[in-house]
């Protein structure tokens, strides 16, 4: 039987380990790491973009991580961006993440293949094997048109989203 106290996990760990504990999301942690030791070392204001299965931003203002009013700053992938019917994992439709992320790239590849597009990744798709970004890049180097088209489309959408961020930061 599990017993869960109504305490933050960081507080429970601090009591057990006797050290200060901070629990943070991946993107804000990466942004802070770049601020401390990365290519932006010495800058006071940073906008860090994490492009992965989803999209997120870490914001550093005057040398401090920005959390936002409710602690959920940086949900870049959930900007209302498209007029599509693709349901985002957040429950909304039209999020930038539905057309400009790793998950969008993968979903689009599978959809277009099932619709009849040819790709050198067909055997991996048919076998249910994992297809990563490196597989897509290899396919592009081998001039796989479907992979090229999808990366161009995702890149275009992502570029438009990033351009919008640059205008507000």
How would you name each of these model-derived features?
Residues 1-45:
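Glycine-rich phosphate-binding loop and adjoining helix at the ATP-binding site
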Residues 4, 8, 25, 30, ...:
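Conserved active-site and cofactor/substrate-binding residues in soluble primary-metabolism enzymes
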Residues 11, 15-19, 37, 42, ...:
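ATP-binding/phosphotransfer module of carbohydrate and carboxylate kinases, centering on a glycine-rich
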Residues 28-29, 54, 102, 106:
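Alpha-helix N-cap/helix-start and coil->helix boundary motif
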Residues 32, 56-58, 166:
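Short active-site-adjacent structural elements
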Residues 35, 65-68, 123:
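Intrinsically disordered, low-complexity boundary segments flanking structured domains
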Residues 40-100:
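Glycine-rich phosphate-binding loop of actin/hexokinase-like ATP-binding domains
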């Amino acid at each position: 039987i599990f017993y869960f106290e109504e305490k933050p996990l960081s507080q429970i760990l601090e009591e057990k380990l006797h050290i200060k504990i901070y629990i943070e999301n991946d993107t804000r942690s990466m942004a802070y790491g770049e601020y401390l030791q990365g290519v932006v070392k010495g800058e006071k204001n940073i906008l860090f973009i994490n492009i992965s299965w989803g999209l997120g931003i870490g914001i550093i203002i005057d040398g401090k991580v920005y959390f936002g009013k409710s602690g959920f700053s940086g949900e870049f992938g959930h900007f209302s961006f498209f007029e599509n019917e693709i349901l985002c994992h957040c429950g909304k439709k039209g999020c930038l993440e539905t057309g400009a992320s790793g998950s969008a790239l993968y979903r689009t590849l599978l959809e277009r293949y099932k619709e009849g597009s040819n790709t050198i990744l067909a055997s991996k798709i048919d076998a249910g094997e994992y297809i990563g970004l490196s597989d897509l890049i290899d396919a592009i180097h081998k001039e796989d048109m479907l992979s090229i088209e999808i990366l161009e489309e995702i890149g275009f959408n992502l570029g438009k989203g990033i351009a919008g961020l640059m205008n507000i930061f």
